[in-house]
């Protein structure tokens, strides 16, 4: 009998996973996606719908009767995957774990229950509640939707006068109209990526983040391995495995963000039961850790399938986000260098002649990225490559 494999969320970020699925024999590949903007693959059938519309998702699954379901790098797709896995008794994350992963308020409550170190927080839905929180806690504070994606709606509040603007800016990105306000923890931001193996969660890659500035909660680069000493690195990796266990995740990839303060205390920002975006799980972590997460996820998700895991040489990797000045693009040069360099694992610059570039305000509207690998000095290699990029603007 043929496998009926359903993959949910099939944009450019999922291409490495989709490529491997289409190599499988005796398998039909089905998909659900937001729209028809990504037409690279010939699926057996595909449903276009809002992934928050669970009625459409379940109806399509009922129609095809999948024997496997997968997703990666997308919170809403993760939620759909968990529901379909539960309904059809398939391998996958549980509905409980998916909800803890995508709902910041539920995750914060789980942290309290399990004694996971986290910032003091409160659930809010009004401006007055922010003022009340600020009376008990010193500025700066952070406000964020409980159900956003990336850094959309995450706003740092430095003074009493900034509260009203911050509230509405955050509310724009809240699906439920609910947000959390929390203490701002000053320190080094890091990410830890891992996988839930049969014996338990394992940390595979630690990276340090650089920010555009202190108030805008947007990263400009993420470096693997992180710029930390070996003792602290080992402490963080062990802590992450403990956090993932306490949150209850037991299937698939994990992607967690932490802040390390000046006392080397480790505060959880959030931990997702999925891979990190911008090819973090499918390109970056394998090339840094040597572990083929894509093949591992396929083998764990599809019964009676055991494909050979690919071999990767462990290297330094830099995910460099691009931040161009605003203006109308007349011409862009230097892409030929990115296309031919063996040090470039992947890149995405969705800018063409005539486009108007706006200022970066969140993870979602950054101007592109380049993923660079090197045995040593990956930042130097990255800078040399990116220096070839040049945008000429209309006057």
Residue ranges: model-predicted function:
Residues 1-96, 305-307, 324, 351-356, ...:
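ATP-binding N-terminal substructure of ATP-dependent carboxylate-amine bond-forming enzymes
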Residues 46-52, 122-126, 155-157:
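Short acidic-hydrophobic, aromatic-tinged amphipathic segments that line or gate anion-handling sites
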Residues 86-153:
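A conserved helix-loop-beta module that forms one wall/lid of the active-site cleft
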Residues 117-119, 136, 140-143, 155-191, ...:
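Conserved ATP-binding module of the ATP-grasp superfamily
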Residues 180, 251-256, 307-313, 394-395:
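Flexible, glycine/charged-enriched surface loops at secondary-structure junctions
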Residues 183-249, 253, 260, 272-296, ...:
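ATP-dependent carboxylate/phosphate-activation module, predominantly the ATP-grasp catalytic core
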Residues 254, 267, 340-355:
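A structural supersecondary motif
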Residues 305-342:
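A glycine-rich beta-turn/hairpin centered on an aromatic-Pro dipeptide
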């Amino acid at each position: 009998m043929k496998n009926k494999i359903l993959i949910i969320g099939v944009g450019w970020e999922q291409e490495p996973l989709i490529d491997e699925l289409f190599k499988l024999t005796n398998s039909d590949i089905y998909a659900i996606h937001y729209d028809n903007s990504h037409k690279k693959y010939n699926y057996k059938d595909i449903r276009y719908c809002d992934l928050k519309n669970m009625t459409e998702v379940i109806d399509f699954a009922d129609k095809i009767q999948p024997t496997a379901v997968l997703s990666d790098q997308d919170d809403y797709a993760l939620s759909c995957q968990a529901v379909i896995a539960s309904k059809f008794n398939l391998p996958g994350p549980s509905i409980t774990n998916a909800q803890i992963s995508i709902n910041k308020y539920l995750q914060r409550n789980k942290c309290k229950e399990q004694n996971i170190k986290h910032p003091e927080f409160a659930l809010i839905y009004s401006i007055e509640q922010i003022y009340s929180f600020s009376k008990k806690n010193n500025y700066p504070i952070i406000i964020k939707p409980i159900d956003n994606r990336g850094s959309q709606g995450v706003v740092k509040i430095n003074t009493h006068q900034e509260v009203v603007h911050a509230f509405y800016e955050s509310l724009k990105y809240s699906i439920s109209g609910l947000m959390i306000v929390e203490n701002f923890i000053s320190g080094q931001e890091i990410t830890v990526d891992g996988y839930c193996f049969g014996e338990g969660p394992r940390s595979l890659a630690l990276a340090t983040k650089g920010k555009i500035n202190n108030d805008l909660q947007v990263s400009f680069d993420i470096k693997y391995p992180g710029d930390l000493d070996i003792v602290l690195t080992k402490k963080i990796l062990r802590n992450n495995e403990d956090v993932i266990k306490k949150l209850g995740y037991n299937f698939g990839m994990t992607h967690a963000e932490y802040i390390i303060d000046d006392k080397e205390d480790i505060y959880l920002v959030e931990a997702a039961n999925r891979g990190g975006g911008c090819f973090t799980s499918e390109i970056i972590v394998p090339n840094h850790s040597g572990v083929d997460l894509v093949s591992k996820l396929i083998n764990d998700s599809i019964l009676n399938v055991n494909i050979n895991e690919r071999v990767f040489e462990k290297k330094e990797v830099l995910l460099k986000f691009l931040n161009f000045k605003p203006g109308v693009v007349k011409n862009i040069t230097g892409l030929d260098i990115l296309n031919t360099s063996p040090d470039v694992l992947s890149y995405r610059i969705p800018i063409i002649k005539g486009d108007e570039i706006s200022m970066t305000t969140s993870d979602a509207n950054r101007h592109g990225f380049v993923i660079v690998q090197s045995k040593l000095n990956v930042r130097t290699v990255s800078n040399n490559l990116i220096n070839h990029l040049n945008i000429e603007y209309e006057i």
